[in-house]
Structures are given as C-alpha cells and as structure tokens.
Amino acid sequence: MARRDFIKQTAAAAAATVAGVPLTGYTQNIVTESEAAKLKWSKAPCRFCGTGCGVNVAVKDNQVVATHGDFNAEVNKGLNCVKGYFLSKIMYGSDRLTQPLLRMKDGKYAKDGEFAPVSWDQAFDVMAEQFKRVLKDKGPEAVGMFGSGQWTVWEGYAALKLMKAGFRTNNLDPNARHCMASAAVGFMRTFGADEPMGCYDDIENADAFVLWGSNMAEMHPILWTRVTDRRLSAPATKVAVLSTFEHRSYELADLTLTFEPQSDLAILNYIANHIIRTKRVNRDFVDKHTVFREGNADIGYGLRPEHPLQQAARNAGDAGGSKPITFDDFARFVSKYDLEYTAKLSGVPKNRLEELAELYADPKVRVTSFWTMGFNQHTRGVWCNNMVYNIHLLTGKISTPGNSPFSLTGQPSACGTAREVGTFSHRLPADLVVTNPEHRRHAEEIWKLPDGTIPSKVGAHAVLQNRMLKDGKINAYWVMVNNNMQAAANLMNEGLPGYRNPENFIVVSDAYPTVTTLSADLILPAAMWVEKEGAYGNAERRTQFWHQLVDAPGQARSDLWQLVEFSKRFKVEEVWPADLLAKKPEYRGKTLYDVLFANGKVNQFPNTELDAEYANQEAQAFGFYLQKGLFEEYAEFGRGHGHDLAPFDVYHKARGLRWPVVDGKETLWRYREGSDPYVKPGTGFQFYGNPDGKAVIFALPYEPPPEAPDKEYPFWLSTGRVLEHWHSGSMTRRVPELYKAFPEAVCFMHPDDAQALGVRRGVEVEVVSRRGRMRTRVETRGRDKPPRGLVFVPWFDAGQLINKVTLDATDPISFQTDFKKCAVKIVKV
C-alpha cells in the first residue's frame, strides 16, 4: 500500500472512530482501488458546514460511490470529519423525493387535500396561479421566500433577482438569519463591511485561541485538528474555552470558563477594563485607526410588539442607534465591570477571569478568537460581536497573522451566498442595502432595470415571516433548502399556524420529506450537491466551484432550474405597475425570464464554453451557460469595491480563492497594508468599509435575557448540534452509520439534577416551557456535561422537536433568534 493511500485510510478511520462508526471492508478499500473500479474522481467542497473542506468525489455508473479528503485542498489537507467521510451516502436515502407532490382533492388543488404526484407543468401552473392571485389582491408585500446558506452562489443570486427585481418584494431571507445575522451586523457596525479580516492561516500563527460559545471539536472538527496541531506542536500555545456547559472542546483547553448564561457580555467588558486598567492599550493603533461610540441600551428582545418586554423597552424602536464618545468615556463605561462584579455575575472564578484577560492584554501573545452560535444565537449577539472586536482593537491584535477575531460559519455558503450575494431582506450583493437609493440604482443599472424597480422598504426577516404567515399578511411563500418548521423557535405557536393558514399557499423545495415539506401545499423535488454545478463561499472568504458529477433521481431538479423556469410563467405587466413599465416599454409582453435571465448578460455565454467532460442540466435546459452568466453578472457588484472575484473559469481549476482577488492574487488578511490591495500605502491599516477608514469601538452594557429560570421553570435550556448530525438531520439521519452513532436526541443533564428529580439515565421525561412540551430521554454520562440548573437538547431529531419549547426572542438589531436561553421544567413521564 502506498503511503498516501495509508494516510487516506488512517484519516478516514480516525474520523469514523470519533463517532464510534464501524467501517466496512468496501468503504475502507474503495479509495485504494480506484483504477480497478474504474472510478472518475473530481473535486468539490463538502456539503456540510462552513469550514469549506475540499473532497474528491468518485463516480461510477452515474452514482457517487466514494469520497475522501482532497490532499490539494488548503483548508483540510486531505482530512474529513465523520460527516464528510460519509458524503457519498447523503443523496441515496430510500425516501428521496423524485416528483412534485401537490395537495389535492377531487383532482384539484385543495389546502386540506392529500399529497398526490403531479407533473412539473401542473405544479408550476398551480403555483403561478396562486402567486398571481396574491400579487393581484394584496401586492408584492404578500409574497415571500425563505432561502438558505446552502444555496449555491448562483441559486441565491437568481432568487435575489426573481424576488427583489421580478416580484419587487424584499421579503427574501435565508436560514442564515438563524445562524449568522448577528455576525454580519456586528461586522457592518464595527468595520462597515461584512466577513472576517483573517483566514485559517491564523491558526498556524497564533499563540492563544479563545473560543466564545463554540464547540469547535464537534461543529468545526477539521479546523479543530489544526488548532490541536498548533497546540501540541507549539507547547507554549494556550487554548481557552468559554461556554455555559462543558463539551468536547474542553478536553484540549488550558483554561475553561463555564459562565452563567448571558454573562459573556460582562466578561467581555471586564477584559476591556483590564486592558485599560493595566495600561496595555495600543494607543498608537487606537488613536490612528478607531473611533468610539456608545450604543443604545434597553433595546428589547425582538418579540411581538404587544409583548410586555417590548412595550417596556426604552429603545426598541432604535435598537441599533449610537452616539459618539471619547476613549475616556469608554474607559469610564467599562470600569464598572471589575473583577469582583464580573466574577459574581458570571460565576467564573476570579483567577480564571484574570488569566483570560491577560491572554488578550499581553502584547507578546498573538490571539485568535473563534465564535459561533453561542455568540450569534443571543438576544445581544450583535453586541457580543462588537465587544470582542473592542478587545482586539484596543490591543491592535487584528488583521495580522495569528491576531484575528474570527466568526466561524455554520453552513457551506452562509458567507458566499447569504451574505456576499445578499439574500437577506435588507441586502443586495457586495454589502449593498435596499434602503440606500444609490445602492438600488447601482443594482438596477447592472440588471438593466428601470429606476425604482427595487423597493426601498426592508422586507420581512425569518422570524417576522413566520409571524406574518400566521397573521395572514404573507400568503404566497416559497421555502428552499431548509427545514424551518423544525429549525425555528416556538414552532407550534408561530411556525405551523402560518403554514396551515387557509389563506396561504406554501411551496417547499427539498430533496427529502421533512417536517417542513409535510406542512406545505406543494413539494418540489430538489437536486442535491454534485447533482448540479455549484459554488460555495466558506468562512475565510474562499469561493469554491464544482461540476455536476451525476444526475438527480427521477424528476428532481436544481433550485436554480426551478427559480429560472418558474420566472417564465410571469409577464412583466402582470407583476410591475404601469408607471414602472412605462420607463422600459420595450419590456412589455416579455416574461420575467426574458428580463432577468435572458437579458443579454446572463445568457451571453454559449454552451460551447462548457467542460465537455461534465453534464450541466441547466445549460442544456436553457440553451446557454447559465451558471457562468449569473456569476459574471453578480461579480460586477464586487469588482473594484473590495469584494473582487476572479473570472469564472479560474475557480473550476483552483481549490478556491479568498476575495478580494485582485490581479490574480487572493487576499489573506484584509485591512492591512501589504496584504490587502485596497489599503493605501503609508496607512498601515485601513478599515475602508467606513468612510473615515476607522473601526468603531462600542460601549455596550450587560443586559439580562428575556426569560430566566424561576420557581415554576427552574432550568435553563440550551439547544445545539452534535458531531454526527448536521442541522435538522434530514441528510445525516439517512446515513445508516451516522444514524447508528447517534440515533436520537437526548436531554443532557447534571447527575445531581437527575437525582433530585428522581430520574435516571435513559428515563423518559418531558421538557416543558411556557410555549410547549416535548418528550426525550435523560443522559447524564454523555459528551456534554451541563452544570446544575441547565439542560442541553440537540435539535437534529425530527421525532423530538425541541423547538416546540424554545422562545422566539431575537437580537433586536440583527433579528437572529436566541436558541441558547429559555426557562424550562423537566417532568418525569
């Protein structure tokens, strides 16, 4: 056996062993027998998290039969986690959706009917009829779409054009609202531009890692292997982990801090105070490159307006507001957060708080901060993001190798599609926003649309969409590549009622039956991953392409095909007002397809430019290289504006490039002279997203959560993920090995709490909140070890819907839901 083959097998076996997954002889040997098996290998990014690992995909007889880590991929260097190891199986569940299904009774669509197979023409006929009815009766604000950070770049871009330019509604939002909205808004508030300034190379250059609400060992395991390698190969390196409960990342940590939920706000301010008090502020950096502002406090919790907490909030109507202050004002503001106060509020021992603060304060220690949902799924998630930037800016530990505040991403293209393309309800591509008239005009110019096409009003975000569906304000709704009925908080009160509202027509495009598809009126079968040509953008700004490698089963079609084909059903005069059409009379009689996708730009690349080795069903269907046309039009937004993308064809050859890509060269560290081509010579650093080129340090307080344990509901509930499953489990639970490794969700609980309740490991209990209840089983010995008074329940299990229980409170600036904190009681069944 060759050394490389041995390494491949060892890496795969290690990944599987983490989850206790058995390896069959066939899957062990298939990567070493490629010649004998006549396999065709091609590159692709992994389908799961936002790490963006490269994989090699083997195809035989129009089926994916094996995958392994791509040794030429800079991100993972040949390694895959256990989910990545079983990628070859995610497309072949026995219940794969292969034809459109419509609720019918007596041969016609009926809201209370049963699902029956229909053709694509029938499906689109009914769907178009319903959308036209709603547009005519109520206008574009009654139409909505909920998309995904799993959309390819061009799928998201096509959806953006169809909704915001075609139907003229900003009621488009991605499921990234649930995971990355606070990170995105945090970047915009501090730097005036979204996405990290650093890259994964920071890992090999850092002297210390601080994890804030991030279980990287399970959620970003390949990056964790790089952190582990750095920690073990450079013994002076330190790892600190902060969380509300103990998890697998604690095993590597030199310093652990288990804190009271919500008190991370106080800890962040304590660190800033410590840096100032011990005179370790990098005054030269701060004076040249930062300004100070105090953010509005008492901003509410994103609940319905009539909720008492919203009524009582002083600044609920201006949650993102702020005013200028000085450095001295900031120093006075954080001085309250001294060691005594912070230790008491957080429950963290004083010596551990001091040790953590010293990692940041010591000018000789290069620090990389990582965070994910613990920060972002937080009613003050934007503040958390702003406050960790405060620490890095005060010390000047930013935009240099090893010094990086780094928001990790949960979905494969939450960055590349949701954020960069701009599929949020307030955004357009390349950090443009719908509220800015110049931004709208720029988009309309690129899209060859009349002035005033794109509406200026911010659309409904994810949580508001559910509320508007329930209230009958959104009536035609399309859901793609997500399982929001399982994923959204308070689902029985705010999710399901809207989907089953008789006034509403709900379309769900997916590859498998889910809780969401079963709540729909029309189900459209979707192609997955390498069944289509695609592009993702990962957490380090790396854009990666792949070819279509196999055909989708049955009548399943890509989301891109669905979006573009559906646009043919609408004449421009059916969806645009007469005054708008009068500005472009040549569009009269044309379809949205003609105006948006056959506009002379998107359709400019002929099919002769396709790689003859690979199929492309969309190009075959529409007669031109659709993906290339969409990408090149989209790239116009960013080129010359700090979001430069390379030419389309380059990405099919490369293992991804980190933008901005200028003159063929990618950018590793943004905002630093010598690394970022947009930084002017002589400035050193330039945070050019803001007009003055300076980053903002925000004074922000600790504020309590909207709900906390009390006598009736004495436990904190936190939800999250586990290594073996991804999000709602609709893919991973159909992989037998992953299902066997972790078949059902459980309620992780401290043994003393279990004893006090009179329950043992494996006993069935109900988790009950003010909103609902669900059944699960107690686990007191597992990998996750909550402190007394807190329970943790993963949300991957469709048979145990923990979001019946959770609270739909959000950060009032980003509108991202806090899935980490609500009050529950545990009742023995």
UniProtKB/Swiss-Prot annotation:
Gene Ontology terms, MF aspect: 4 iron, 4 sulfur cluster binding; electron transfer activity; iron ion binding; molybdenum ion binding; molybdopterin cofactor binding; nitrate reductase (cytochrome) activity
Domain 4Fe-4S Mo/W bis-MGD-type positions: 39-95
Keyword 4Fe-4S: yes
Co-factor: note: Binds 1 [4Fe-4S] cluster.
Catalysed reactions, semicolon-separated: 2 Fe(II)-[cytochrome] + nitrate + 2 H(+) = 2 Fe(III)-[cytochrome] + nitrite + H2O
Cellular location(s): Periplasm
A Pfam family this chain is assigned to: Molybdopterin
Binding-site positions, Mo-bis(molybdopterin guanine dinucleotide): 83, 150, 175, 179, 212-219, 243-247, 262-264, 373, 377, 483, 509-510, 532, 559, 719-728, 803, 820
Cited Gene3D superfamilies: 2.40.40.20, 3.30.200.210, 3.40.50.740, Dimethylsulfoxide Reductase, domain 2 (3.40.228.10)
InterPro entries from the UniProt entry: Asp_de-COase-like_dom_sf (IPR009010), CT_Nitrate-R-NapA-like (IPR041957), MoPterin_dinucl-bd_dom (IPR006657), Mopterin_OxRdtase (IPR006656), Mopterin_OxRdtase_4Fe-4S_dom (IPR006963), MopterinOxRdtase_cofactor_BS (IPR027467), Periplasm_NO3_reductase_lsu (IPR010051), Prok_molybdopt-oxidoreductase (IPR050123)
Positions that bind [4Fe-4S] cluster: C46, C49, C53, C81
Signal peptide boundaries: 1-36
Any GO CC annotation of this UniProt entry: nitrate reductase complex
Reported cofactor(s): [4Fe-4S] cluster; Mo-bis(molybdopterin guanine dinucleotide)
Gene Ontology BP terms: cellular respiration; Mo-molybdopterin cofactor biosynthetic process; nitrate assimilation
Keyword Lipoprotein set for record: no
Quaternary data: Component of the periplasmic nitrate reductase NapAB complex composed of NapA and NapB.
Function of the protein: Catalytic subunit of the periplasmic nitrate reductase complex NapAB. Receives electrons from NapB and catalyzes the reduction of nitrate to nitrite.
Entry similarity comment: Belongs to the prokaryotic molybdopterin-containing oxidoreductase family. NasA/NapA/NarB subfamily.
Name by which UniProt lists this protein: Periplasmic nitrate reductase
Organism listed in the record: Bordetella bronchiseptica (strain ATCC BAA-588 / NCTC 13252 / RB50) (Alcaligenes bronchisepticus)
